[in-house]
């Protein structure tokens, strides 16, 4: 039986790792790195674009793109799943869909799985072993209340010592009911750590002991995904779970990276806007960055 690490031990491990290894996004080279997803008018991913198809604005001012990459880059992901009481009837559907995501990870990708209810658990260290991740997925336990924001926040914590592209993939079928922190704190934390959040929300029905209740995913998840450059998917049936988890894997392997040198390192939060020259194409990227030399990307 796999032993799941307690929150206290996880926090200690994260702090130790962070002290030993600084993430790429804390290097002092003056490049703002912006992972970007491009879709067409039908929502399909657009591959094989070149640098001249993009433009980027910093506080509304066009910037010269000084770094561009259109090759698949490895990512590190925390897959955090709602295993609260409202999901009891749908847990097997969720596990199978999550397996589809894990099976599509490339050898250089790393991940861990976790679950939240009235407690939060993680599978251990990040690994590229998909079989280990699938085995860990089967051992996650379910509970009752929904600690959504606590779970996402702690997932971001797990990514602190990680270099490169950092992802939280969160799934829920309802509102947060039990967290100690709120949405605003989680958003600030994700921005600070430059973590992309992908969120999948499912509308579902469950029996609360007295009557059938229809749950709705927390509406703030959409804003969290939009602000961090991830994606938000709201589903009406469990049949959509598999294709949606597969779509997220495809997106993560189809990201472009755009970089520019900021004109002023004023330590302030700046607004970012990535635009496409083809009118039928849409770019999705994080909305802000902090113009501080200590918080910009190292492209070496």
Please describe what each predicted stretch is.
Residues 18-300:
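Scaffold/interface architecture of coatomer-like assemblies
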Residues 5-16:
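Bacterial N-terminal signal peptides
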């Amino acid at each position: 039986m796999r032993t799941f690490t307690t929150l206290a031990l996880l926090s200690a491990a994260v702090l130790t790792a962070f002290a030993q290894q600084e993430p790429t996004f804390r290097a002092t080279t003056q490049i703002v790195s912006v992972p970007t997803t491009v879709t067409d008018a039908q929502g399909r991913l657009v591959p094989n674009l070149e640098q001249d198809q993009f433009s980027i604005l910093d506080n509304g001012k066009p910037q010269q793109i000084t770094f561009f990459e259109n090759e698949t880059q490895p990512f590190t992901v925390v897959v955090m799943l709602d295993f609260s009481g409202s999901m009891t009837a749908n847990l097997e559907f969720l596990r199978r869909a999550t397996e589809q995501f894990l099976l599509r990870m490339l050898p250089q990708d790393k991940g861990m799985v976790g679950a939240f209810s009235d407690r939060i658990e993680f599978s251990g260290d990040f690994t590229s072993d998909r079989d280990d991740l699938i085995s860990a997925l089967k051992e996650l336990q379910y509970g009752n209340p929904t600690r959504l924001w606590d779970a996402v926040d702690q997932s971001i914590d797990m990514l602190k010592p990680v270099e490169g592209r950092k992802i939280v993939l969160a799934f829920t079928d309802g509102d947060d009911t039990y967290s100690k922190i709120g949405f605003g704190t989680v958003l600030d934390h994700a921005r600070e750590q430059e973590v992309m959040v992908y969120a999948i929300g499912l509308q579902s029905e469950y029996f609360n002991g007295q009557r059938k209740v229809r749950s709705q995913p927390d509406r703030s998840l959409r804003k969290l995904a939009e602000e961090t450059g991830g994606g938000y998917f709201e589903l009406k049936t469990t049949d959509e779970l598999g294709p949606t988890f597969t779509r997220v894997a495809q997106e993560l392997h189809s990201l472009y990276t755009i970089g520019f040198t900021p004109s002023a390192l004023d330590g302030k939060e700046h607004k970012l806007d990535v635009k496409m020259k083809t009118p039928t194409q849409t770019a999705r990227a994080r909305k802000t960055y902090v113009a501080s030399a200590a918080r910009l990307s190292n492209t070496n």
